[in-house]
């Protein structure tokens, strides 16, 4: 049995909140710089260059990349042989988020009730997804999610007869409907299968995959490549002002489903696709 202290979790989450909101991961920076080279529209290139400059300023002056520093989404992989000590795991995660957003001077964007809309003043609670794995591994992925792109996301319950063409249609329709409102260029997470909530969680988790890293399943990889090409042919472009770089990646996850269903979720993220992973 391996023991992990809540204090270590709090400290890690706090640091991850500040890191994720001030610095893009290397894969996203690379995708952005490559986008400048690929973009055919002069205006589109200008917008991408401004986004690159914004990254530089954020890192140099230690200010957030975007004013929407997101709602904290946390994926936890915890081994069966791990014992959390000195407190509760969920309390520790939320305390880490609280400290990170307060000490990092990050925008507090969470309200305590969806109808009454009273701000919690510390960006808690986080949205936490747990996965129990063998052994004594403890891995945390933090993904602060902004809601400009979140509001453009969808879950569609297709019929099995809709097949792969139906899945393609949902992806393209979702991106097309989002247009400039998702702050393109974007990363598109897709979940196919499971049930209503499982496909949505997969779509969210797909956003944490490195840009340019494809599925290990051959047909899924082919679908990712095809959909990225089709999305970029929509011509939405950077900032929604036209161009050839609408998305950097389409990441798809799948799961077994019921014989009567074909659930599809599309979770869109803007170019500020923040994700940090740490093992304790």
Please report, for each region that a protein language model flagged, where it lies by residue.
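Non-transmembrane, aqueous-exposed alpha-helical and coiled segments at domain scale
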Residues: 1-190, 195-280
């Amino acid at each position: 049995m391996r023991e992990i202290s809540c204090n270590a979790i709090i400290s890690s989450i706090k640091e991850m909140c500040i890191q994720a909101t001030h610095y893009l991961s290397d894969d996203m920076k690379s995708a952005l710089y490559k986008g400048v080279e690929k973009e055919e529209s002069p205006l589109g290139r200008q917008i991408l260059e401004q986004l690159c400059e914004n990254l530089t300023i954020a890192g140099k002056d230690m200010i957030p990349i975007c004013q929407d520093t997101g709602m904290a989404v946390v994926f936890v992989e915890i081994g069966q042989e791990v014992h959390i000590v000195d407190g509760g795991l969920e309390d520790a995660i939320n305390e880490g988020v609280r400290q990170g957003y307060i000490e990092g001077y990050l925008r507090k964007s969470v309200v305590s009730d969806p109808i009454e809309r009273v701000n919690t003043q510390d960006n808690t609670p986080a949205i936490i997804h747990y996965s129990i794995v063998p052994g004594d591994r403890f891995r945390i992925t933090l993904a602060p999610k902004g809601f400009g792109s979140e509001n453009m996301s969808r879950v569609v319950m297709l019929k099995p007869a809709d097949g792969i063409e139906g899945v393609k249609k949902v992806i393209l329709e979702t991106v097309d409907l989002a247009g400039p409102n998702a702050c393109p260029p974007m990363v598109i997470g897709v979940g196919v299968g499971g049930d209503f909530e499982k496909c949505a969680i997969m779509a969210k988790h797909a956003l944490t995959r490195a840009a340019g890293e494809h599925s290990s399943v051959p047909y899924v990889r082919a679908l990712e490549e095809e959909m990225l090409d089709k999305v970029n042919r929509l011509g939405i472009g950077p900032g929604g002002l036209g161009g050839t770089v609408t998305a950097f990646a389409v990441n798809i996850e799948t799961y077994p489903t019921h014989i009567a269903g074909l659930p599809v979720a599309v979770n869109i993220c803007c170019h500020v696709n923040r994700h940090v992973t740490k093992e304790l």
